[in-house]
């Protein structure tokens, strides 16, 4: 190439998936990778700027949803009325209408209100928005970051990369969801893309969980069970045909249990049931 590769070069030349760099716990961003391994790379961000780039790299740059990426794009041009501008742009460019649940979820993502209490500390600096009358503007801390042209350049490249990934991999959603059939999602992705108000740790989901507010009911199945798991979680979930699955409820349930009734009467109750299947727990991408 004759120069330090840009993020787009990884997709253009297909040498490696740069998301593996983002997912690496000792790196977390392409910026951090360059600082660590590229002698000619001289840009140095502040600790807060570095954390913001890591957050966007790890949580948003895969392109699984366009909303946060286009929101960040708006913040490079405007300081106020961000949500209103975002809704208008999504409607015009993507024919995508943002309902109240989705708007609340996006705002929570961009104000560090979506994570569980323990996870909030990790990205405590990553509050991009602040409330302004009936809309949101750029937070003071994020506004300060945007005064650094080097930070802005890294941010814009990252956002453009995410938007490109969205268009290639995630723009053909299933029905009226934010999900694409046969793509891989983490538990956190599922909670976010189903527009839950808060994230849930996998332990609390425990195979499935009904969210009353959004009336969504994701079911998570490990198809191959490990030999060392307890008998109470050694469920005999299996496909009997390509469109027929036998899935077992959580232990201690009866036909009258609320979660069982929600599943059996999902259509009548207006509940959306989503099925996520992974081969086994060794699939780190779908963790």
Where are these regions (language model features)?
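C-terminal, active-site-flanking charged/polar segments
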Residues: 1, 287
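Long, largely alpha-helical accessory region at the distal end of helicase-like NTP-driven motors
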Residues: 2-86
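Generic alpha-helical secondary structure signal
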Residues: 17, 34-35, 41, 45, ...
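Acidic, glycine-rich low-complexity segments with interspersed aromatic residues
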Residues: 35, 47-56, 61, 65-66, ...
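Terminal accessory regions of large proteins
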Residues: 51-55, 59-146
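Charge-dense, extended regions
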Residues: 103-213
